[in-house]
């Protein structure tokens, strides 16, 4: 498919810079502009079997290129998921029996959901086959062709919703301006589209495997707006009041735009509106179950967060244990060296103690021998003294001392 090169942003800026092989970047509004996206005339299906947005886009192209379910599967899967999510947001700001138009309604499931809730709902699609499929599947008013081709009454709609559509518009200003003319003064747009986060280069996105790369489908995603760009776009249309809601998918933005301040309805007001009809009661029951499921999801996410924190703590502790083990391993040689060094002086100390004990033992033995010898000598002396006391000499000595005392001569101690 040969495409005309596009070199102008929706905001009118022509000084676009290279962003990637397929996209240019606008510094004025933060939008990525496809170089080779489809042109306005290519939106009108002339050959439903071969034109880009014809029958095969819904039956095989999205499945083969993006891994999405085909339109038959989506008609079942989307009802309890995104359709309920979108309806909850719509009813936060508009209640039945408001008149609502969905651009690019695909299988028509959300149009049906709005109808069951009590809205006067209708949808638009480009492929004759898809329009027929949606009509037969959900029995809702689905019309063929771009919004500009429809004969719709100006200022007659309470809301126009477009989910994953605005990025496909070759001339979003013309299309959305026409849509704005169909809205009542207090009418709103509700939009879901990819959210380009400014500040990242293409090379950084590739290196980080950024999830937004999947949205850079240059043939069909012609304008990828940032939040700044989306705000500027709708303010230029006169819709100065914007409320960014929680997006269903992380790569998207989801918001409500209005000319007047947005005043949300309460859950009680929404429920009262739905309970007025049998089909509305069914929708209320689905919303209740959806709320229960969402709470379980939040609990599951919290558990996952706690589990991840526990895993992170466990990993940190394991790292600490491994570090300490490495420190112990590195200290083992030092410990062995110190042990060896300690063992050597301990051996010397043991030998010294052995020598001291041996010396002390010898000394004690010598002293004991000397004591024994002295004791033996003392016994000999005592024997000699005893012998002397019995001898004649001793007797004469005794008489001599007695004589000296008798004559008054001083004597030494006997």
Task: Please describe what each predicted stretch is.
Residues 164-168:
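A short His-aromatic
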Residues 148, 169-288, 408:
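S-adenosyl-L-methionine-dependent methyltransferase catalytic module, highlighting the catalytic core
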Residues 365-396:
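Compositionally biased, charge-rich terminal segments
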Residues 401-414:
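Low-complexity, charge- and small-residue-enriched intrinsically disordered regions
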Residues 1-163, 173-178, 207, 246, ...:
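Conserved N-terminal segment of class I S-adenosyl-L-methionine
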């Amino acid at each position: 498919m040969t495409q005309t090169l596009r070199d102008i942003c929706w905001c009118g800026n022509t000084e676009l810079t290279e962003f990637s092989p397929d996209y240019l970047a606008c510094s004025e509004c933060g939008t990525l502009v496809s170089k080779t996206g489809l042109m306005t005339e290519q939106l009108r299906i002339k050959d439903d079997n071969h034109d880009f947005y014809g029958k095969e886009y819904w039956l095989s192209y999205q499945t083969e290129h993006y891994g999405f379910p085909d339109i038959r599967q989506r008609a079942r899967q989307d009802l309890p998921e995104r359709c309920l999510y979108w309806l909850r947001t719509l009813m936060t700001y508009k209640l039945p029996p408001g008149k609502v138009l969905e651009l690019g309604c695909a299988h028509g499931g959300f149009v049906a959901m709005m109808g069951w809730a009590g809205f006067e709902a209708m949808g638009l699609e480009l492929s004759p086959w898809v329009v027929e499929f949606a009509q037969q599947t959900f029995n809702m008013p689905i019309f063929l062709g771009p919004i500009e081709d429809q004969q719709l009454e100006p200022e007659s709609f309470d809301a126009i919703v477009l989910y994953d559509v605005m990025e496909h518009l070759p001339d979003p200003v013309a299309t959305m301006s026409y849509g704005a003319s169909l809205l009542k003064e207090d009418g709103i747009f509700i939009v879901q589209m990819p959210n380009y986060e400014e500040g990242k280069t293409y090379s950084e996105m590739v290196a980080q495997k950024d999830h937004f790369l999947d949205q850079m489908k240059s043939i069909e995603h012609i304008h990828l707006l940032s939040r700044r760009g989306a705000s500027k776009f709708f303010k230029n249309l006169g819709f100065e009041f914007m409320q960014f809601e929680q997006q269903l998918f992380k790569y998207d933005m989801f918001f409500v735009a209005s000319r007047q301040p947005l005043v949300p309805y309460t859950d009680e007001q929404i429920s009262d509106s739905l309970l007025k009809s049998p089909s509305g009661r069914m929708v209320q029951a689905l919303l209740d179950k959806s709320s229960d499921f969402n709470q379980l999801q939040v609990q599951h996410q919290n558990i996952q967060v706690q589990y991840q924190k526990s895993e992170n703590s466990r990993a940190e502790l394991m790292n600490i244990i491994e570090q300490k083990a490495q420190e112990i391993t590195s200290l083992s040689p030092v410990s062995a060296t110190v042990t060896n060094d300690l063992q050597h002086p301990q051996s010397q100390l043991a030998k010294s103690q052995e020598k001291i004990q041996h010396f002390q033992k010898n000394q004690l033995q010598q002293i004991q021998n000397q004591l024994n010898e002295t004791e033996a000598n003392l016994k000999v002396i005592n024997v000699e003294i005893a012998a002397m006391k019995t001898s004649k000499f001793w007797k004469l000595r005794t008489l001599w001392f007695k004589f000296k005392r008798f004559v008054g001569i001083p004597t030494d101690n006997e």
